[in-house]
Amino acid sequence: MAGYDVVVVGGGHAGLEAAWAAAALGVRVALVTVNPDRIGMMPCNPAVGGPGKSQLVAEVVALGGLMGRAADAAAIHTRVLNRSKGPAVQSLRVQVDRDLYALKAQEILAERPVEVLRGEVAALWVEGGRLLGVRTVDGRTLPAKAVVVAGGTFLSGVVWYGRKSRPAGRQGEPPARFLSQSLKAVGHTLRRFKTGTPPRIRADSVDFGRLEVVPPEVPPGSFTGNPGPHAARLPTWQTRTTARTHRLIRENLHLSPLYAGDIQGIGPRYCPSIEDKVVRFADKESHLLFVEPDGLSTTEVYLQGFSSSLPPELQEEMVRSLPGFERAVIQRYAYAVEYDSLDPTELTRGLQSRLLPGLFSAGQVNGTSGYEEAAAQGLLAGLNAARFALGLPEVHLPRESGYIGVLVDDLVGRGTDEPYRMMTSRVELRLLCRADNADERLTPLAVAWGLRPKEDLERVEAKYRRVAAELRRLQALRVEGVSGLQWLRRPENTYRALAERFPPSEPLSPEEAYQVEVRAKYAGYIERQERLREKMKDLEAFRIPEGMDFPKVPGLSREAAEKLSRHRPKSLAEAARIPGVRDSDLTALAVHLRRGA
C-alpha cells in the first residue's frame, strides 16, 4: 500500500513547521487537518514575538523555518521591547494582519511538496508495538513511517462561556474527539490544561481619542531582514481597567467556570485571565490593556490582557467599564478552552515518544503555550520525524545552543505542571544566545541537517568574517589615548560615531555594525558566559549509562534517586536540571561514575 514517510496531524504553528521541515529532507509528507483553509490561523493574539519569543522566532528563522517569513510579510506594526535594557533581553514584537498571516503561511508551505489532506485523525495505527500510520474518522488508513501529533488545543477540547460549555477545539471548530484515547493506549500520560482568549471588539464602536496611542517604529523591525510593505502602517493603543471593572469581576466570580470548579485544567501562570489578575493582584487599582488591530481591512480590534471565561452578558458590562469602550460592541466573546496534553517527560530531546518509536509531538499538546513555542517544537519534531523515516539518528539542540534547546530541555528534563511559556529569564546564556546572532549559532546546524542550502552558510560566514575584521581594526586603532575597542566600551560612545571619525575601508551593514558594538561593549560579560558555557558542556559530556540503578549509588538521597529513576537523564548536565537533585547528589553521582559504574 502506498503511503507517506511523515504524517503531520494538525495545521497550526507546530504542524506547519513540522511539515515544512520534514519536506526539506525530501521525504513524502502529508498534513492532515479538519479545515485546510484554517492552516496557520491565529486563534489568539494577532502578533508574533515579544520577550523570550522573538528569540525563538529568530532561531526558527536560522534553522530554515517559515514563521519569521510569514510574520514579516503580514506585519502591520513593529516595536522592539526592552530597548532601554541590554541586548540579551531586547525583543522584537510584530503585530500582523491575522488573515494575511495565515495566507502567507499557506503560500510558503506550498513551496514544498506537502500533501494537505482534509480530515480528522481518529487513532494511531499500531500493530505489534509498531507505528504504521494513522486512521481517520471517515475510515481512511494513512500508512506512515513517522507521525507528528500537533493537535494544539483540539485534543478532547471543551470551550467555556461562563458555566456553559460545549466540545470544541476553539470557537466554531470541532475538537479531536478520539485521538486522546489512542495516545493513552500507547501508554502516554495525559493532563488537562486550559487557556483563554479575549473578546474582539467592533473597531467603529471604540472611542480611540480616549486611548493612549502607541505608534509603530520607523524604520520597522523584522525577523528576516525583509520588512513587509505594511510593517509601519498602523498604531496600537493602550487603556486600563477601572474600579468598576474590578467590582464587576469580584461580584461575579461564582459565574466563572474556573472559580466555580467546573474547569479542571491548569491555566498559564504568565498569561492569566482578567479575573485571575483581579483576584491574584488584589492590591492593584488597575491593569494595563493593549488594543490591537486585527488587520488592515478588518473591523475588529483585539483586547490583549482581557482574556476571560465569564458569561457573555457580563463581558458586555466589563468591556464598557473601560475608558474608550463605553459604547463598545463585542463581535466575538472571550472564552476559555480546556484540552488534553501529554507529559513531555515521556519524550526524547528530539520530541519522539519514548513509548512508541516513530511517534513525535509538538506544540500545546506537549504542554506549552504560545505560537512561537509551538513553531520551535514543530520544526524539531518534523526534522526528526523525517530523519526517522530515512533511518537517520535523532538530533537535538543542547541547552547551551539557545532558546529552543532550553525550551526542549525544560520540557523533557523537568516537565511542566502548567502551560509553559518561554521567557528570557529561563536562559542561563541569554547574552550569548541573542536573537541577533541566531544565524551565527544555528545556520551551520541547519545546513548540516539539510534544512537550508550551503549558500546560506557562506553568506553568514562572510558576515561574521567582516565583523571579526572590524573588531581587529578597532583593537589596533588609537582613539583619545586608548584602543578603538576600549573607547567604544564607554557607555556614551557608539560605533556609528567611531565609524564616522575613522571609517572602515568598506562600510558595514546595520546588522554587522550592531554586532561590532555589542561584542565591544559587552566583551567582559560575554567572556564570563562563554566560561559558563564550557562548564555546561563539560557536564553534558559526563554521560550516564542507560539503565543505571540510581538507588544503588552511594551517597545519593532518596528523593534524587527517585527523580533520576523517573527522568532517566543521559548526562550530569541533565541530572543537574532536575528539581530535587542537589549539588551533593551530583557529587555522589560523579564519584560513582568516575569509579567506572
Curated annotation (Swiss-Prot):
Coiled coil, from the record: none
Molecular-function GO terms, alphabetical: flavin adenine dinucleotide binding
PROSITE patterns: GIDA_1, GIDA_2
Source organism (scientific name): Thermus thermophilus (strain ATCC 27634 / DSM 579 / HB8)
Localization in the cell: Cytoplasm
Organismal lineage: Bacteria, Thermotogati, Deinococcota, Deinococci, Thermales
Any one Gene Ontology BP term: tRNA wobble uridine modification
Pfam family of the protein (one): GIDA_C_1st
Gene that specifies this protein: mnmG
Classification via InterPro entries: FAD/NAD-bd_sf, GIDA_C_N, MnmG, MnmG-rel, MnmG-rel_CS, MnmG_C, MnmG_C_subdom, MnmG_C_subdom_sf
GO cellular component: cytosol
Keywords assigned: Cytoplasm, FAD, Flavoprotein, NAD, tRNA processing
Cofactor(s) recorded in Swiss-Prot or TrEMBL: FAD
Binding site for NAD(+): 267-281
Disulfide cysteine pairs (residue numbers): none
Name the record gives this protein: tRNA uridine 5-carboxymethylaminomethyl modification enzyme MnmG
Summary of the function given for this chain in its UniProt record: NAD-binding protein involved in the addition of a carboxymethylaminomethyl (cmnm) group at the wobble position (U34) of certain tRNAs, forming tRNA-cmnm(5)s(2)U34.
Assigned protein family: Belongs to the MnmG family.
Residues engaged in binding FAD: G10, G11, G12, H13, A14, G15
Predominant localisation class: cytoplasm
Assembly and oligomerization: Homodimer. Heterotetramer of two MnmE and two MnmG subunits.
